[in-house]
Regions:
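Alpha-helical transmembrane bundles and membrane-interface segments of multipass inner-membrane proteins
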Residues: 1-193
């Protein structure tokens, strides 16, 4: 750059604008739309958008690997986009009484503890390496299933029968895995890992 400023096309030898990153940015930009669709009582459309976001998550990862590896930007923004969508869905579905408020609070609290812990450790000068744990990956999978089923039920009137017990079981599984994954991250941080 002529002025000596950063080159926005490249960051530390890593491209900012790539097809996988554009897909991830589009998913992040879809979060406000998903919020509005739930608030405006259009859960069927929110369900379709949530599924599209899931497909885009798989596609951007596949493309990143196929195009020569994941970028640093993608490695940062992809989990942010995923978490932003999930947390927004939990809060919004609780706000419209499609999901228990206590569960949304638990999910948000766990994420706040993890982010707060990373910030505190960083301020204390401790190196922070963020590596997802198996229990955290399981928690995310359960959260995705719960949000998808909740949106599906609300959007397509799929109440009763097998759906209600599955939804109840998923609710408790998400609560348990949220607590377990939060505790695992706190334990790992306390041990210096």
């Amino acid at each position: 750059m002529p002025d000596g400023g950063p080159d926005l096309a490249r960051t530390s030898g890593d491209q900012l604008v790539t097809l996988p990153n554009l897909i991830t940015f589009a998913r992040l930009c879809a979060v406000p739309l998903a919020f509005w669709l739930v608030i405006d009582r259009r859960p069927g459309a929110a369900f379709a958008l949530f599924l599209a976001a899931g497909v885009s998550d798989a596609i951007d990862g596949w493309l990143a690997r196929r195009m020569g590896g994941a970028s640093q930007v993608g490695a940062l923004i992809d989990p942010v986009a995923d978490k932003a969508l999930l947390v927004t869905m939990f809060i919004t579905l609780a706000a419209v009484n499609e999901m228990p408020s206590w569960l949304a609070i638990l999910v948000v609290f766990r994420d706040a503890v993890i982010v707060g812990g990373v910030l505190v450790l960083g301020l204390l000068g401790r190196a922070v390496v963020i590596r997802p744990l198996f229990v955290s990956k399981a928690n995310t999978a359960l959260q995705i299933m719960l949000v998808a089923l909740t949106l599906f039920m609300a959007g397509y009137g799929a109440h009763g029968g097998w759906v209600t017990p599955v939804l109840d079981a998923l609710t408790w599984a998400v609560a348990a895995s949220t607590l377990a994954s939060g505790a695992a991250y706190v334990w790992r941080a306390a041990r210096g890992g």
